């Protein structure tokens, strides 16, 4: 599945918050380094929760990353000796990320992206569904529901300990202070009173 002599391909790692997406991306990047492959990691500038210039998992694993403001900025950092391009928090990138990932894979790079497949409302998030559709390999991870202990496929946003309303802003960068993993049955999204 991961033979480097193959032409380029796309791998998507997705799931809810706290499911281990960044941890899995870091693991795959580290494996490429053991194989003497050259990897570069990108993250959106908006993701500054733990570090400005590292991808950091919730359990503290980290790898150096290049923060970029726009998807097409990724091209400025790619060199011929690169084998693997990794992109974390891909849901925060602009709509051009799908084209950027396609171009990189078509040029022969192994492209690994990680991100939320659903927003806090349980709806498809950003460009992740499109990336899943064009990827050769998709890994969907689950966390453990913080309410009942079942497998969690959704991300619950909390505002002062209560579920956020459906029409609250989609993007709010945060961690355990704002989000919990939830299963389908414990996930709640009330409609906001007008």
Swiss-Prot record:
One of its GO terms (biological process) is thymidine metabolic process. It catalyses: thymidine + ATP = dTMP + ADP + H(+). The active site is at residue 89. The keyword Metal-binding applies. Its EC number is 2.7.1.21. It is found in: Cytoplasm. The keyword Kinase applies. It comes from the Bacteria. One of its GO terms (cellular component) is cytosol. One of its GO terms (molecular function) is ATP binding. Keywords: ATP-binding, Cytoplasm, DNA synthesis, Kinase, Metal-binding, Nucleotide-binding, Transferase, Zinc. It holds the Pfam family TK. Zn(2+) binds at residues 145, 148, 183, 186. ATP binds at residues 15-22, 88-91. Belongs to the thymidine kinase family. NCBIfam families: PRK04296.1-1. Homotetramer. This is Thymidine kinase.
């Amino acid at each position: 599945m991961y033979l480097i002599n193959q032409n380029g391909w796309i791998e998507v790692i997705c799931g809810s918050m706290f499911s281990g997406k960044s941890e899995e991306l870091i693991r795959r990047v580290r494996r490429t380094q053991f194989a003497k492959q050259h990897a570069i990691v990108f993250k959106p500038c908006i993701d500054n929760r733990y570090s400005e210039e590292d991808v950091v998992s919730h359990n503290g694993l980290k790898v150096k990353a290049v923060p970029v403001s726009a998807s097409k900025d990724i091209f400025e950092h790619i060199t011929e000796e690169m084998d693997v391009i990794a992109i974390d928090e891909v849901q925060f990138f602009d709509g051009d990320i799908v084209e950027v990932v396609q171009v990189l894979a078509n040029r022969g790079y192994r492209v690994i992206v990680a991100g939320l497949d659903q927003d806090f409302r349980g709806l498809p998030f950003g460009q992740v569904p499109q990336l899943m559709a064009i990827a050769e390999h998709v890994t969907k991870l689950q966390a453990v529901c913080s309410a009942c202990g079942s497998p969690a496929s959704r991300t619950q946003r909390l505002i002062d300990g209560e579920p956020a309303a459906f029409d609250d802003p989609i993007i709010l960068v945060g961690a355990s202070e704002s989000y919990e993993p939830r299963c389908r049955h414990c996930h709640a999204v009330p409609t906001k009173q007008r």
